[in-house]
Amino acid sequence: TFNVEKVTTVARHHETHASAAFYMSPFKEALIVSYDGGGDDGHFNVYAGNKDGVKPLDNITADFGGGYLLCGSLVREVAEKSRHQLALSGKLMGLCAYGKSIEKHVPAFQEFFFDRDYKKLAFLTKLPLKNIEDPWKNPLENWVFEGQEGYDIAATAQEAFERAFFSVLDRYDPNVPLILTGGCALNVLVNEKVKCLYNRPLYVPPNPHDGGLSLGHLFRYKEPTKQVDITYSGLPLLNKRTDLKFYVAKYNATKVTKKEIAELIKDGKILGLVYGDSEVGPRALGNRSIVCDPNIADMKDILNSKVKFREWYRPF
């Protein structure tokens, strides 16, 4: 038995995402969309944030996160080294730039994001419908596409993802600021289109994925009275008082000017630049950067193969 002396609060998955994002945002009022691969309260939830806190508006029947993940498993370039891993989504997003969306297939993919009925994608295979198995549980060679065909499937999935998302967003008041959170808010292609197509303030937290849930739970327990900006509150790379002195001595390091940095880049060098503390979340947002000259034709390939050790199609 356990002696419980204090009340334990339990916050639901998307409520926690929404709270973290709202209290980190600069907005006093906002429409909050939280969507990902799913939690105890669904996959796609909409909230209103205002002076009274974060309140639920809708639970949408959709699975954009799981659907997009499964689309990644259909493309060999994406799936062959990382099947069933969450990295599939980010890789699919990178690969889609090499393909062209197949317009006639977009509606089927759109429907797929709402119900994840894989049989709606049966036209992608040569198997009779009765022989189709769940490609997520039982990967079949017939489901895997490669080369330009695979790139086009990736582009089609991304296009359908965007249209499906906009079809939901258009149901709500366009005159209030918008906050996007949940793992799907890491799809920067969607975020950029929202920014360009919708004339409204937009905020995406640096940690919209599940790594931000603990902060959201804290905010639900004790609501902040002002914006909490933790974007650059991660760990420092070096302790200036101890580590920096050690490495300066070890490598006989000297201070460099901005002009010298520019000259090194001009000469084809690849540099790592670090400022202050690390960013919170999975994305580098300026305080830790790899910089190089993009005018060098094969620089992307050099970065991917020798520095980041990742797939050839990943962008800068």
Model-predicted segments: where are they?
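Flexible beta->alpha loop and helix N-cap segments adjacent to enzyme active/binding sites
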Residues: 2-9, 15-116, 121, 186-187, ...
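Active-site cores of enzymes that catalyze phosphoryl transfer or operate on phosphate-rich substrates
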Residues: 94, 105-156
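Short, flexible coil/linker elements and helix-boundary hinge sites characteristic
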Residues: 3, 126, 173-175, 252
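Short amphipathic alpha-helical segments, especially helix-boundary/capping motifs
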Residues: 45-46, 139-146, 168-171, 193-196
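Alpha-helix N-cap/helix-initiation motif
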Residues: 154, 158, 179, 203-210
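Short acidic-aromatic active-site loops that bind/stabilize oxyanions
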Residues: 8-11, 147-163
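Phosphate/ATP-binding catalytic cores across multiple sugar-kinase/actin-like superfamilies
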Residues: 155-178
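Glycine-rich beta-strand-to-loop/alpha-helix junction loops that act as flexible
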Residues: 177-186
